[in-house]
Every structure is written in C-alpha cells, then in structure tokens.
Amino acid sequence: MSDVITTDQPASATSLLQAKGIANLVERALLTEVRLTPKPGLVDIRNSGAHKDMDLALFEKSTLAVAPWMENFYQLGYDTSALEAELVLPMLRPIGMACEADMLQATGGVNTHRGAVFSFGLISAVTGRMVALEEELEQNRICYWVARMCRDLVAKELSSEATNAATSKSVEHFLHYGLSGARGEAESGFQTVRTVALPIFERIRAQNEDMNLALLQTLLHLMAWNNDTNLVSRGALKGLYYVQQQAQKMLWEGGVLMRGGLEALQAFDDELIARNLSPGGSADLLAVTWFLSHFPKGETFAD
C-alpha cells in the first residue's frame, strides 16, 4: 500500500478496531458483488461481461488494494467529527487519489473500482464520524451524513459555472443530459439504494434464504431505475434506456425469481455483451446495498 496519510490526533484502540472492521466489510461487499453470477454486462465468475481489459481475478486483486484504504477514510472522518460535514469532503480527496494510485498499480492501469472508492470512501469517513460522535451506525443515519458531507456537490463540480472547456465525461453527462451520476447519488444520501435497492433486498431475504437470488433481483431493480452514466458512456442515452426497459420487462415477468429466471438473466448478459453495455454504476450501488444491509435501518430522514 502507498504511504498512509496520518493525522496528528492519536487513534484510540476502539477507533482502530472499528476502522479495520469497516474496511473488512467493504472488502467483503466488493468481493460479494464481483463474484455474484450471472450479472448482465458485468464481470463475474461466468465471464468478463462487456469488458476486454478486466476479469474476475483483476477485480479481486484490485479489491485487496483498495479496501485497506477505507481505514484511512474512516480515521479522517473520526478525527474531523467536530467540523461541519461538508468541510471534510475536500480533505478526503488526497486519500482517494492515493487509493486510486494503488488500484491502478495493482491492475496495470485499469480502472476497476474508481466509483466504488468514491462511494465507500464517503461511507467509511461517515462511519468514523458517527463513532466519534457516539451515534448508532444505522442505514439511514449513514446515508444522512453522506448527504451532509456532499451538500451541493453536483452544483460545485458539474454545473456550467463550475467547469471550463476541458470537461470530463461526468460534466458532459450532466450538462447534456442532466445526469449527475455517482455525485448526485451521494448528494442524495444514496436515495436509489434507500428507496429501491434496500427495500427489495431485505424483503426477498426475509422470504427467501438464497442470498444470490436476492442480490440478483436487487441488481435488476437497480438496472431498471438507476440512471447509470456508465451505460451512457458506452451507449449514449439509447444504451441507458435499452437496459432500463429490458430490466423492467424482466422484472414484470418475475425477474430471477420466475421459472427460468437465471437462464433469462444469462441471455440478458449475452445481449449486453454483444451491445458493449456494462451497468457499472448499478454494480457499485449493489455493493453499497449489501454493505448497508448489515446495519439496522434507523429513522428515515427527509430528502
């Protein structure tokens, strides 16, 4: 791992234990997501999805490179708990950049987890903050603090006033299509996860002990309703709408829970590979869903 970013305040034994626990849970979330099979257009055990430059082994290697950095995000969140939440976000960037550098070194320059580093870096920092403030780690409270930390993030980073001629894909998606991507999801406190993914996942888990089926059905719901900018990058709005419509159609018929559901999902996978479409944003949100499912729901906060 690259040089660890330290803070002046010594970490307590409890804080270090919590930090390691959060990092381990993030690692499990990322490995659970990538090994889930079959996933339409995504890397899994069956194939490399619509990707020519990555496979399961590379994702696993990348996970082992990025997960330890979650302890650093956590510790910074813990150490800055007295500050206004939105002031902490810029402080996380150097850790994120160092984490990405380790990821790229591990993968030979392939971007496997940039979106996941963004989401889980925020979540890890927020959990550190909550432990410092002696708050219970709950799904909605974690999402509330992520929203607070990312207040006005879209306007600050994606609006026309915040950009110049040298625009990124994220800025292009926002200015041309009004799609805010991972930044918008974070600013909303993972609204898609809270209102779509977690309720579906937890309901199926309560009715069915099969974790894989619950996750695959949840992924279909995310693909149906998430405005995944990864799909826009590969297939423009036409690609996004195609995936959403096909996922909605499959869910209308029962999804993976219907007879022949897994075979239908494999056919969906083959079709997305042929179209070079990969819903990577939804995959990241599925990992976030699995992570948050390990905490009690808590009180709902107003969006």
Swiss-Prot record:
Domain of life: Bacteria
A GO MF label: triphosphoribosyl-dephospho-CoA synthase activity
Record InterPro entries: CitG, TriPribosyl-deP-CoA_syn_CitG
GO biological process: prosthetic group biosynthetic process
Alphabetical keyword list: ATP-binding, Nucleotide-binding, Transferase
Enzyme Commission numbers on file: 2.4.2.52
Any Pfam family: CitG
Keyword Nucleotide-binding: yes
Keyword Isomerase on entry: no
Catalytic activity: 3'-dephospho-CoA + ATP = 2'-(5''-triphospho-alpha-D-ribosyl)-3'-dephospho-CoA + adenine
Gene3D superfamilies linked to this entry: Triphosphoribosyl-dephospho-CoA protein
HAMAP family in the cross-refs: CitG
Family, per entry: Belongs to the CitG/MdcB family.
Function recorded in the entry: Catalyzes the formation of 2-(5''-triphosphoribosyl)-3'-dephosphocoenzyme-A, the precursor of the prosthetic group of the holo-acyl carrier protein (gamma chain) of citrate lyase, from ATP and dephospho-CoA.
Protein name: 2-(5''-triphosphoribosyl)-3'-dephosphocoenzyme-A synthase
Organism of this sequence: Escherichia fergusonii (strain ATCC 35469 / DSM 13698 / CCUG 18766 / IAM 14443 / JCM 21226 / LMG 7866 / NBRC 102419 / NCTC 12128 / CDC 0568-73)
Higher taxonomy: Bacteria, Pseudomonadati, Pseudomonadota, Gammaproteobacteria, Enterobacterales
